[in-house]
Design a protein with these regions (language model features):
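Active-site pocket-lining/capping segments in soluble small-molecule metabolic enzymes
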Residues: 1-92, 96-171
Length: 171
């Protein structure tokens, strides 16, 4: 993991705190799971499901969706990166065992309203805040400025000095 995998002891402490305070605790799987991290994720997911079940597991791609279905019976939430953009996608996600989906952030209110009215499952929306443009193994900004190796990223892109420009040099 780019930011380091959560240890089972840390997850258990969070789970205990959530139970004591009546707060929901969802388990958010990584968007990208490298081949050499598959076993770690499987072991952690299995242990959490057995001993410290979260309220739900958030999945970001069809591979992790299949993994959660195979290893657990936990409720599954589809993250926005699964591109829930229309009724067919929402129905497919429901048929795959998803119990809640986050709509694609590209949708506007006019597009969201009919989906919300006719959705086969509960929906969530991202309404503000920074949104990643892509998920990549390597960060362009970080690779030039450093701090993008294994471990915590220095996130130079969030310091307000960098922006994407189109071919006309406009933001």
């Amino acid at each position: 993991y780019h930011h380091g995998a959560i240890r089972l002891d840390d997850y258990r402490a969070a789970w205990d705190m959530a139970r004591q305070t009546g707060v929901r605790l969802d388990f958010n799987l990584p968007r990208i799971i490298k081949e050499n991290h598959q076993k770690v994720v499987e072991d952690l997911l299995t242990a959490c499901a057995k001993d410290f079940p979260p309220t739900a597991v958030h999945v970001h791609n069809i591979g992790t969706l299949a993994l959660v279905r195979r290893l657990t019976s936990l409720p599954i939430h589809a993250d926005y990166s699964l591109i829930a953009y229309n009724q067919r996608t929402l129905q497919f996600l429901r048929d795959q065992g998803v119990v809640e989906a986050t709509l694609s952030p590209e949708l506007n209110m006019k597009q969201i309203q009919p989906l919300a009215k006719n959705s086969p499952l509960p929906l969530t929306c991202i309404v503000h805040g920074r949104l990643e443009l892509m998920v990549s193994e390597y960060c362009v900004t970080g690779s030039f400025l450093g701090g993008n190796g294994e471990g915590p990223c220095s996130q130079p892109c969030l310091k307000g000095k960098y922006a994407l420009k189109d071919r006309k040099e406009a933001l």
